[in-house]
Structure formats: structure tokens, C-alpha cells
Regions:
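Re-entrant/interfacial helical elements at transmembrane boundaries that shape
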Residues: 51-60, 90-94, 106-110, 142, ...
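Hydrophobic core segments of alpha-helical transmembrane domains in multi-pass membrane transport
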Residues: 85-94, 125-136, 163-175, 191, ...
């Protein structure tokens, strides 16, 4: 299968930009469709620009926010450049990319089933999907709970959990097309105000990041010095 990788890479680029009538949606049927699905699925994978990953990063214990922010930046590279690229190459080399967008899980399982001996490929993908789906539910539940608590207070935590649990069941029995459409719409509604905020605060981010890197990239100073530095940054934000 390794000898098919160069052809797979060529197929991805040629079919994305020449308008080949592909049915899979992975390669796409034109440059606009390629961009549409690429951006939509990329955001769904790495949450770039949505502001949701910052909620999880804010819960981390770190000596300075800029340090955690720099670490969080790696998730886009790992999720999209490494994991998604490898998965895409497996699907294209296996020839399962034209099964249709509604058969995404079967498409991936079938591709890995051809790549690995016996039933190991399909089994690994099936088990991984269970863990990925469960962890995704937990993650987005946490994101939403932090948001609702910040908006209306702690009393909304329990009602939100009940509503989220019920909505998870609805998502499990709804059609895949409806689930994808709702997810893409929700991601867009999150990204638009967040990107506006990022643009407005871009100068602040650049200033604070430069000061952090110039101050001490390795954070080898004492805790008191770190606390003083953080306090000065908070004053500068006003």
C-alpha cells in the first residue's frame, strides 16, 4: 500500500482543483466544494478560531497564560496536519473515498480493514470511534456548562446537564446529514463572534506574547517573580 501514497497525494490535489465529479466529498468535486468541506471538517477536527479550546486550556495549571496558549497551538498541527492527513491517505490509497459522505465511519473502517491483516483494521477503528465519540460528548458538555454558568450562574449547571444528555440522544438517532448540518451551523455561529474578538484583541495578544517570550521562555524564575510578572500583565490589560 505504501507504493500508492504518491498517487494518492496527486489524486487529492488534482481532483480537488480540476472539478472531478467525485461522490465521496473527501476529494471533492471542485475547488469551492473542496474549500467548503475542508474548512468545515478542519474546524470540526481542531476547533481553530471557535474559542472552545480556550475553555479547556483555561482549566490547565500553568505559570502563565501565554505558556498554555503556545502549547494549545500544537493541537491544530497534530489534529489536522498529522492525524487527518494520515487518515486521508489511508482512505484514498484503499480506494474507499468514493463511498459517499454519509458513510464516513464505514469508509474509514473499510480502508483500515484493507490496510491491516484480518479484522484488526475495522476493530481498531470501531473501538477508537467509541472512545472518540464519548470523549467528544464529555468535552463539549464541559464547554457548554462553563459558558452557561458564566452567563447565568451556577444554578444552571444541573438543568444544562439534563438538557445536554437529552440532546445527545437526539443526535444519536437523527440522520447523519442533519447532524453534520447542525454541527457546521453551530461551529460557524461560534467562530464569527470569536474571530471578530480575536481581530480586535490581536494587538494585545502580540504584545503579551512578545513580553512573555522576552521575559523568560523557560520560566526558571522563582514563584514570587512569576506572580509579580502575572500581576503586572493583568494591570496592563486594563
Amino acid at each position: 500500500m505504501a507504493d500508492r501514497v504518491p498517487d494518492a497525494i496527486a489524486t487529492i490535489f488534482t481532483d480537488a482543483f480540476t472539478g472531478t465529479a467525485a461522490t465521496g466529498g473527501f476529494v471533492g468535486s471542485g475547488i469551492m466544494l473542496a474549500i467548503q468541506f475542508g474548512v468545515a471538517r478542519g474546524i470540526f477536527s481542531n476547533e481553530s478560531g471557535m474559542g472552545s479550546a480556550a475553555i479547556a486550556a483555561a482549566a490547565a495549571k500553568t505559570q502563565h497564560p501565554a505558556r498554555q496558549a503556545l502549547v494549545s497551538m500544537t493541537q491544530t498541527f497534530i489534529d489536522t496536519i498529522i492525524v487527518v492527513t494520515i487518515t486521508g491517505l489511508v482512505i484514498v490509497t484503499a480506494g474507499t473515498w468514493d463511498m459517499g459522505r454519509d458513510q464516513a465511519a464505514i469508509m474509514t473502517a473499510s480502508a483500515f480493514g484493507q490496510a491491516l491483516p484480518g479484522e484488526w483494521g475495522s476493530l481498531i477503528v470501531s473501538v477508537a470511534l467509541i472512545f472518540f465519540a464519548f470523549s467528544t460528548i464529555l468535552g463539549w458538555s464541559y464547554y457548554g456548562e462553563r459558558a452557561i454558568v458564566a452567563l447565568v450562574g451556577d444554578w444552571a449547571s444541573i438543568p444544562y446537564r439534563m438538557f445536554f444528555t437529552a440532546l445527545s440522544f437526539v443526535g444519536a438517532v437523527a440522520s447523519l446529514e442533519l447532524a453534520w448540518t447542525f454541527s457546521d451551523l453551530s461551529n460557524g455561529l461560534m467562530a464569527i463572534p470569536n474571530l471578530i474578538g480575536l481581530l480586535i484583541l490581536s494587538g494585545l495578544v502580540v504584545r503579551e506574547t512578545r513580553e512573555y517570550l522576552d521575559w523568560d521562555p523557560k520560566l526558571t524564575k522563582s514563584p514570587d517573580e512569576v506572580a509579580g510578572f502575572v500581576a503586572r500583565q493583568k494591570m496592563n490589560w486594563r
